[in-house]
Amino acid sequence: MAFYFDQDDAALEHFDRYFLRQSQEKREHAQELMSLQNLRGGRICLHDIRKPEGQGWESGLKAMECTFHLEKNINQSLLELHQLARENGDPQLCDFLENDFLNQQAKTIKELGGYLSNLHKMGAPEAGLAEYLFNKLTLGRSQKHTRAQTGPTATGCLPLLAPPGGTSMFPFQNILFIFLLSVLPLLAIKLSVLKAIKVSS
């Protein structure tokens, strides 16, 4: 999914980085579960991983919806595993799941729910500008915040716009600035046309 948004016909780099970060987190979670299995003398049984039903996600909104449902399914599986551990009197596994997985899942689901609400309110996917702004202002800012907390990384990014003080502007200021950048060249063209008309007349 991450590399879909890195393609030249999608070109939404912060969607790309967001999904790549999610993929890395899930791989780390799988490694933690396998390490716990080995630590406790168990055996790891691997199963086939089914490929996604769709090869292209068409829009950032559809990709976010797909991710949201996947995260809810993962959360449900973890809850069922927690219930099984509790029924079999395994407090260590219960504690491991609560501290390392379930709390993080709740935060991820809440975050994705907020992203979906914002995309719908902005008119995605019909309004192409909505996904562009969401990519730059929401995902870009959240990745900057993550980078500030964890330090510079290979996938870190700078804010779209920032005043001389270095802190990023509020979203509405970013939107206003982008609007002005798109309108000012048009005004300059109109003025040059008007001057040309006056000169010719």
Curated annotation (Swiss-Prot):
GO biological process assignments: intracellular iron ion homeostasis; iron ion transport
Domain of life: Eukaryota
Annotated signal peptide: none
GO cellular component, one term: cytoplasm
PROSITE patterns named among the record's database cross-references: FERRITIN_2, FERRITIN_LIKE
Domain Ferritin-like diiron: 1-123
Any one GO molecular-function label of the UniProt entry: ferrous iron binding
Record keywords, A-Z: Iron, Iron storage, Metal-binding
Pfam families: Ferritin
Homology family: Belongs to the ferritin family.
Record-given protein name: Putative ferritin heavy polypeptide-like 19
Highest classification ranks of the organism: Eukaryota, Metazoa, Chordata, Craniata, Vertebrata
Annotated gene: FTH1P19
